[in-house]
């Protein structure tokens, strides 16, 4: 009987080593497959709009149309939409045909409560600890340490687009703390 000599070119892989490699590959594939939705959940989707903007959404998750948004609103009205990072954001009506060029993030800078607009007093009043903000979102009474964050509000194809505000805060003259 002839002896088969091993060549130096062919690696010697035993049955145990092959099964270990196969098991490792299978477990790795399953783990990566299970990890994909978790990673996708924490990375926000890139939305439409110029300059990295996000299309404003209504309470049902539908895009907000400017013409429908302005139908039943008057100058000075503020209405909540879902804005950047999913945060509630106030859109301010300028007149029957236009909105202001900024939106106001409705998250209180004290403890993160949603701050409602008080029409009677013409200011935002936090229900959690009494912080107050003027009509532009500038803090006028604590304990909130900072003004409400701003976002640019524009329209593209009748859709309201919100984009990050990175310029000087027009209310305080300071660099934006949220950028």
Curated annotation (Swiss-Prot):
Entry keywords, A to Z: 2Fe-2S, Disulfide bond, Electron transport, Iron, Iron-sulfur, Membrane, Metal-binding, Thylakoid, Translocase, Transmembrane, Transmembrane helix, Transport
TM helices/strands, residue ranges: 21-43
Domain Rieske: 61-162
Cysteines paired by S-S bonds: 113-128
GO biological process: photosynthesis
CDD domains to which the protein is assigned, alphabetical: Rieske_cytochrome_b6f
Needed cofactors: [2Fe-2S] cluster
Annotated EC: 7.1.1.6
Gene Ontology CC annotations of this record: plasma membrane-derived thylakoid membrane
InterPro entries for this protein: Cyt_b6_f_Rieske, Rieske_2Fe-2S, Rieske_2Fe-2S_sf, Rieske_Fe-S_prot, Rieske_Fe-S_prot_C
Residues the record lists as binding [2Fe-2S] cluster: 108, 110, 126, 129
Note: The Rieske iron-sulfur protein is a high potential 2Fe-2S protein.
Function of the protein: Component of the cytochrome b6-f complex, which mediates electron transfer between photosystem II (PSII) and photosystem I (PSI), cyclic electron flow around PSI, and state transitions.
Protein name: Cytochrome b6-f complex iron-sulfur subunit
Originating organism: Desmonostoc sp. (strain PCC 7906) (Nostoc sp. (strain PCC 7906))
Organism lineage string: Bacteria, Bacillati, Cyanobacteriota, Cyanophyceae, Nostocales
